[in-house]
Amino acid sequence: MNSTLFSQVENHSVHSNFSEKNAQLLAFENDDCHLPLAMIFTLALAYGAVIILGVSGNLALIIIILKQKEMRNVTNILIVNLSFSDLLVAIMCLPFTFVYTLMDHWVFGEAMCKLNPFVQCVSITVSIFSLVLIAVERHQLIINPRGWRPNNRHAYVGIAVIWVLAVASSLPFLIYQVMTDEPFQNVTLDAYKDKYVCFDQFPSDSHRLSYTTLLLVLQYFGPLCFIFICYFKIYIRLKRRNNMMDKMRDNKYRSSETKRINIMLLSIVVAFAVCWLPLTIFNTVFDWNHQIIATCNHNLLFLLCHLTAMISTCVNPIFYGFLNKNFQRDLQFFFNFCDFRSRDDDYETIAMSTMHTDVSKTSLKQASPVAFKKINNNDDNEKI
């Protein structure tokens, strides 16, 4: 899912635009193959909006969490890691990919040729596995509240492991990414004189296909299946818990809270899958048979798929932060340039659970009326 994301731009341009057949190259000189200015302008606005929202949204989340010491729990530590990786994607992935795809030649130098896809692959791997760690933390918080629960130290260790894995899985881009003018050497058109392309040059097509297939599993299908399983189990547990609580407390409040949580859980999984699905399909098709994709429609189709995937950098802060009332409140202070004030008694302590984390099936049966009343009172303040 990397050639998928990064080298795909390079490879698409090289293999599609500069094949051994001059007809393909000449096709790009045909006016019918150039994107209309109106389309380029629209895409530029869309990419600009995603970059601005992705950078500002994730930066705001990072600052708000780091500013508040009482917010440095496992969930928020993982959210900061997620936001940081999304921030890198918004900075390193969107502008370079957009410019290179439109220009069909590389203008950012040899060092950036190697660094750009490497950083992009690292960032996306970190982002996706941050979602996995958050799913694990939610799972333990709700499914097994009396069992093993990750603490801050576990979160930091998990983040370190993610970054090591991301760097290791991205090393082929540092090794095989090259900047060359070879595709233009036999071209007599002045427009392509002194032009370079940046793409991966694996030892063979089988090596490239093996690597891109591995990334496809590592960066999409594997994490998506795992996240879906975790949130499905959470959904089932919350539904059962809701049925138990309906017998002992106000049904209207409990039903609305459960509905809200279920929608959030569904939205998290759907947003992740939907944002990345078009680019995943596009890259899979291109990797195995790039001739299926029409030369003239290639760049536009890729940019649309890529833009859809990059929207995930804006969606994540909304789901993991701005739907939380604490973040909404602190965001007002953030944009008003006011000091952040500590509000320990005011802060939510549970992001997805409708019950206190110590309340399980067993504890519900054993709780005394007085204790249960206290739990209810506390629970009213622990909303998403």
From Swiss-Prot:
Q: Which cysteines are joined by disulfide bonds?
A: C113-C198
Species annotation: Homo sapiens (Human)
Against Gene3D superfamilies, the record matches this protein to:
Rhodopsin 7-helix transmembrane proteins (1.20.1070.10)
Give UniProt keywords alphabetically. Cell membrane, Disulfide bond, G-protein coupled receptor, Glycoprotein, Lipoprotein, Membrane, Palmitate, Phosphoprotein, Receptor, Transducer, Transmembrane, Transmembrane helix
Single GO biological process annotation from the record: regulation of multicellular organism growth
Quick one: a GO cellular component term? Answer: plasma membrane
Q: Which residues are glycosylated?
A: N2, N11, N17
Q: Give the sites modified to Phosphoserine.
A: S368
| Compartments, record wording | Cell membrane
Protein family (similarity comment): Belongs to the G-protein coupled receptor 1 family.
- What ranges are annotated Cytoplasmic (topological domains)? 66-76, 138-154, 233-260, 321-384
Question: InterPro entries from the xrefs?
Answer: GPCR_Rhodpsn, GPCR_Rhodpsn_7TM, NPY1_rcpt, NPY_rcpt
| Gene Ontology molecular function: any one | neuropeptide Y receptor activity
PROSITE patterns per the UniProt record, alphabetical: G_PROTEIN_RECEP_F1_1, G_PROTEIN_RECEP_F1_2
- Listed name of the protein: Neuropeptide Y receptor type 1
- Carries keyword Coiled coil? no
Q: Lipid (S-palmitoyl cysteine) attached at which positions?
A: C338
Transmembrane residue ranges: 45-65, 77-97, 117-137, 155-175, 212-232, 261-281, 300-320
Query: Does this entry carry the keyword Membrane?
Result: yes
